[in-house]
């Protein structure tokens, strides 16, 4: 073969690799810039603010704010709204953990039940699916407005009026403004709103399960309960694990639901609400940033423990 042809092919390959690399960088760069501008830089800047005294007095010259070390973190830990004060006042940290795990567990369980129901053949399945999906697609502001009207302790409240007419209760109850009860109601409302996400994910996996597994189990004399625990659940365990992980992260950082329902009062103040209050009510941006970093660290600890447990269970198989 001619040496010139070999050199030409080598040069052509180099040009092709160069063009491919340039195309790859051209495609990656816009996304990388967006991620840097909207995720990485704000996160790093937030950590920087948490170690400085930043408020309205120096907001225009924030990069010259005085360094205070871990003082903002100490103030957060000593704050009445953050600390566990007893069973009557859990504090924002404990409330966040209870709210996140309870709402995530309940929404995942409801999603599993709904998916099992929709996986069965019956008339009106499309209508049932649309009804189940409604809480997830409806605007949060509209949902909060309707539920506040339903749970209103005044005579105009639908639920109180109904319960009074049925003689189930003697006096009206303030479902969203009673310490203890309000947190339970918010957890139930959160589970109702977000169970369709789990339902869709679980249903898609259920429809991919091989029917021959159930047919073989039927031949062996297995009943419905045995099929569920020995076939369905093992097939769903990874999907349920992924759903629980995602919903836990989202619920742990949830702000709008609780803020619209209770404003963070009556024992429902979570860390995201506390961050908002420090930053935009007290204008103590350093303490607000420190609270958000603490929230992130708590979430990371739970995620590391959860993922390590999952990896151990996978390794045993």
Which ranges hold each PLM region?
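Short, Lys/Arg-rich, polar N-terminal cytosolic tail immediately upstream
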Residues: 1-19
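A structural signal for multi-pass alpha-helical bundles of membrane permease subunits
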Residues: 19-317
């Amino acid at each position: 073969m001619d040496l010139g042809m070999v050199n030409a092919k080598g040069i052509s390959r180099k040009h092709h690799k160069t063009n491919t690399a340039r195309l790859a960088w051209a495609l990656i760069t816009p996304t990388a810039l967006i991620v840097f501008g909207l995720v990485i830089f704000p996160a790093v800047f937030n950590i920087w603010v948490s170690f400085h005294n930043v408020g309205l007095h120096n907001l225009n010259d924030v990069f010259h704010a005085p360094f205070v070390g871990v003082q903002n973190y100490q103030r957060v830990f000593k704050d009445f709204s953050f600390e566990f004060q007893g069973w009557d006042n859990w504090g924002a940290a404990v409330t966040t953990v209870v709210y996140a795990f309870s709402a995530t567990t309940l929404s995942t369980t409801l999603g599993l039940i709904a998916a099992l129901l929709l996986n069965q053949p019956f008339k009106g399945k499309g209508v049932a699916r649309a009804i189940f999906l409604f809480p997830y697609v409806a605007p949060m502001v509209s949902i909060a407005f309707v539920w506040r009207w339903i749970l209103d302790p005044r005579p105009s409240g639908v639920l109180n009026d109904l319960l009074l007419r049925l003689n189930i209760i003697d006096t009206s109850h303030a479902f969203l403004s009673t310490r203890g009860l309000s947190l339970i109601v918010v957890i139930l409302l959160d589970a109702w709103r977000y169970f369709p996400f789990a339902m869709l994910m679980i249903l898609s996996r259920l429809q991919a399960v091989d029917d021959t597994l159930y047919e073989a189990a039927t031949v062996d004399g297995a009943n419905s309960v045995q099929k569920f625990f020995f076939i369905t659940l093992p097939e769903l365990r990874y999907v349920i694990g992924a759903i629980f992980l995602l919903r836990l992260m989202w619920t742990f950082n949830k702000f709008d639901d609780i803020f619209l329902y209770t404003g963070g009062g009556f024992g429902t103040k979570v860390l995201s609400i506390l961050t908002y209050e420090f930053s935009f009510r007290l204008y103590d941006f350093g303490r607000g940033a420190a609270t958000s970093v603490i929230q992130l660290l708590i979430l990371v600890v739970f995620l590391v423990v959860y993922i390590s447990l999952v990896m151990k269970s996978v390794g045993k198989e």
